[in-house]
Regions:
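N-terminal intrinsically disordered, acidic low-complexity segments at the extreme N-terminus
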Residues: 1-7
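N-terminal Sec-pathway targeting helices
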Residues: 9-22
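Hydrophobic membrane-insertion alpha-helices, especially the h-region
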Residues: 19-32
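N-terminal module-boundary/linker segments of secreted carbohydrate-active enzymes
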Residues: 33-102
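Active-site-proximal segments of metallohydrolase catalytic domains
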Residues: 65, 109-226
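Loop/turn elements at helix/coil->beta-strand transitions in domains of secreted/extracellular proteins
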Residues: 71-75, 186-191, 287-288
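Active-site-surrounding "flap" and adjacent substrate/cofactor-binding loops of secreted or lumenal enzymes
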Residues: 85-125
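Extracellular hydrolytic enzyme modules, especially secreted metalloproteases
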Residues: 190, 196-354
Length: 354
C-alpha cells in the first residue's frame, strides 16, 4: 500500500527532502502489547486472506470513518448458512471474553492499549447464532474474480437481528457519549458479522475477511430525531470475518476494524487482481511488523501471540502516539542524545525527515 508523506515547513533546510519515513518505532518503539492465547482454544494454521479494498480506501483517502477517540458501541453477531443449521445455534465459549477490557489479548484490551485509552469499545455479543434461509451455494460467485453474495446474506441476518435488538443503542458516535441521544448520526457505529465458515467465492475468491457488510439495512428502530436507524454497507461501519480460534478471530477483527478507523492496508494487494499470483511472491509491505500489514496473526501463523501492535505511522494517523500525539518527536535537523524508551512509560516515537 502507499503511505502518505508529510511536507516539512518551508523554513527547514533544503537538503532535507520532505519524505516522511515509516517511524523508527517499528522495531523498538512499538508499545509492546501483552498478548495471550485463550488457553481453552486450540491453535490453528488458517491463513488470513482479505478481500480487495476499493481504490479510495487503498490510498488511505477515506472520507468517512469512525472517530479515533471516545466510546463506540459495537454489535457482534455470529451467523451461519442454512446448510450448517445442524451444528446448532451456540456461539463460541470465548465470544464474550474477546471484549473483556481486563484480559490481555482481547479486542477491547488491544485497542485500549494502542490508543492510550482514547478509544473505548463497548461490545454487545448476541447470545445465539443466526442462520440464513438459504445454503451457502446460494451466495457464491461464479468465479474467484468477482464478489460473492455476502451483501444479501448480511442483509437477511441483520433483518433477523432487528427483531431482537434496538439498533439505536449502537448509535453512539455523538459528543455526549450517550447512545441515540439526538447528537448521533442514526447510523449504527459498527457491526461484526462472524461467520461459522467462509466458503470460497462467498466474499471474493479465497478471502476470509472483508470490510463492509455489502448492503444497507434500514431497521425498524426509530432514533431520537424520529428517523429510522440504519446499518450501512460501508467499510467504516462493519465487517464480515471468519470464525477461527480465539487469537486468530481477534486478530482478523482488529485488522478489519482498523479500516473502520480509516486506515489503509500496509501491504501490496496486487496479487488479489492478478490471476495465479501467489501472495508469498509479492511484497508484504510492512509484513508482520504492524496490524495493517500482515500482522493480524502476529509473528506466528497460528496467532498464538495475538496480533502485532500497530505501527508507529498508523498510530500517528490516529493521534495515538501518546495522547493526541504528545509523544511524537519530529527530528528535523541532525541531532544527538536521542534516547528510545518504552512509549508506555513516557518514551517518544521519532519521526525522521530525509
Amino acid at each position: 500500500m502507499t503511505s502518505t508523506s508529510e511536507q516539512p515547513p518551508s523554513q527547514r533546510p533544503s537538503p532535507w527532502r520532505p519524505l516522511a519515513l515509516a517511524l523508527l518505532a517499528v522495531l523498538g518503539l512499538l508499545a509492546i502489547w501483552s498478548k495471550i492465547r485463550d488457553p481453552e482454544e486450540p491453535t490453528a494454521t488458517t491463513p488470513f486472506v482479505e478481500a480487495p479494498v476499493d481504490e479510495v480506501t487503498r490510498l488511505g483517502l477515506v472520507a468517512l470513518r469512525q472517530p479515533s477517540t471516545g466510546t463506540l458501541n459495537v454489535l457482534v453477531v455470529f451467523a451461519q448458512f442454512q446448510n450448517e443449521i445442524g451444528l446448532g445455534e451456540r456461539i463460541p465459549d470465548y465470544a464474550t471474553r474477546m471484549f473483556d477490557p481486563d484480559t490481555p489479548g482481547s479486542f477491547t484490551h488491544y485497542y485500549n492499549e494502542m490508543s492510550f485509552g482514547q478509544l473505548q469499545i463497548n461490545a454487545t455479543v448476541l447470545p445465539r447464532r443466526y442462520t440464513s434461509t438459504q445454503p451457502a451455494s446460494a451466495f457464491l460467485a461464479d468465479t474467484s474474480t468477482e464478489y460473492g453474495g455476502y451483501g444479501d446474506f448480511s442483509h437477511e441476518i441483520m433483518k433477523q437481528v432487528d427483531a431482537d435488538v434496538d439498533f439505536g443503542q449502537f448509535d453512539n458516535n455523538g459528543p455526549d457519549g450517550v447512545p441515540d441521544s439526538g447528537d448521533d448520526d442514526r447510523i449504527v457505529d459498527y457491526v461484526f458479522l462472524i461467520m461459522r465458515s467462509v466458503p470460497r467465492n462467498f466474499l471474493y475468491g479465497g478471502a476470509t475477511g472483508i470490510k463492509g457488510l455489502g448492503r444497507d439495512v434500514v431497521t425498524d428502530d426509530i432514533g431520537a430525531k424520529g428517523r429510522k436507524i440504519m446499518v450501512l454497507r460501508k467499510g467504516y461501519t462493519g465487517s464480515i470475518v471468519a470464525e477461527r480460534p480465539y487469537a486468530q478471530t481477534v486478530g482478523i477483527m482488529a485488522h478489519e476494524f482498523g479500516h473502520g478507523l480509516g486506515l489503509p492496508d500496509l501491504y501490496d494487494t496486487s496479487f488479489q487482481k492478478v490471476a495465479n499470483q501467489d501472495p508469498a511472491d509479492d511484497s508484504a509491505g510492512i509484513g508482520r511488523w504492524g496490524l495493517m500489514g500482515r500482522g493480524a496473526y502476529g509473528w506466528t501463523e497460528d496467532a498464538s501471540q495475538g496480533p502485532s501492535p500497530m505501527s508507529a505511522w498508523t498510530r500517528e494517523q490516529l493521534g495515538w502516539v501518546g495522547v493526541d500525539n504528545d509523544q511524537l518527536q519530529q527530528v528535523i535537523m541532525p541531532a544527538g542524545g536521542l534516547h528510545l524508551t518504552d512509549v508506555r512509560h513516557g518514551g517518544s516515537m521519532l519521526k525522521v525527515f530525509l
